[in-house]
């Protein structure tokens, strides 16, 4: 994995900018996305560019291994590293698919109503999957139950019947960049709002809703 990876990011003005990552930095980005996706209660912004770059790097590694001497200890080490990367990548993608299936109407609605300058939640492939899952669910409900009900009961609002992600769930996090004046909202009427600072390297247990913007910006890492 000697090749560098090119990622397209966005600057503060919303314009695309190219980010050059070393292979080690690329895998670190993948692992961060994997951990955040595993522990966040909602579906996060898709990282399709990271996924594509990692897959390209795996192809380069396979080509390099084909040219390496058989029996070389380095070959075995690289093969184990490739399997580890494949595991992280497949686990990340499976986690996203599970969330899409679990929250599909809410995910599609959020994707539909997001502003143009906001990053997409779903990759093009995930969007197709979510729409097909929605259509198949509606067809199944209609064929197995709804068509046998009175006309006034033959419609179902999936946004109301399918549970939403629990944004008030508590998550463990590690602070990557110091944050000041984080507003913590009360959990009941007897409490008041208060403000805290999050020191770099510190770990906390907090409500996801409070730190969701920091997860999106990369300022904190879910653990």
Swiss-Prot record:
Protein name, UniProt field: DNA replication complex GINS protein SLD5
UniProt entry keywords in alphabetical sequence: Acetylation, Chromosome, DNA replication, Nucleus, Phosphoprotein
GO biological process terms on file: DNA-templated DNA replication; double-strand break repair via break-induced replication; inner cell mass cell proliferation
Gene: GINS4
Family: Belongs to the GINS4/SLD5 family.
Species of the source: Bos taurus
Any one cellular-component term (Gene Ontology): CMG complex
Membrane-spanning intervals of the chain: none
Annotated region described as Important for GINS complex assembly, given as residue ranges: 166-223
Function as written in the Swiss-Prot or TrEMBL entry: Required for initiation of chromosomal DNA replication. Core component of CDC45-MCM-GINS (CMG) helicase, the molecular machine that unwinds template DNA during replication, and around which the replisome is built.
PANTHER family in the cross-refs: DNA REPLICATION COMPLEX GINS PROTEIN SLD5, SLD5 PROTEIN
Lineage summary: Eukaryota, Metazoa, Chordata, Craniata, Vertebrata
Modified residues (N-acetylmethionine): 1
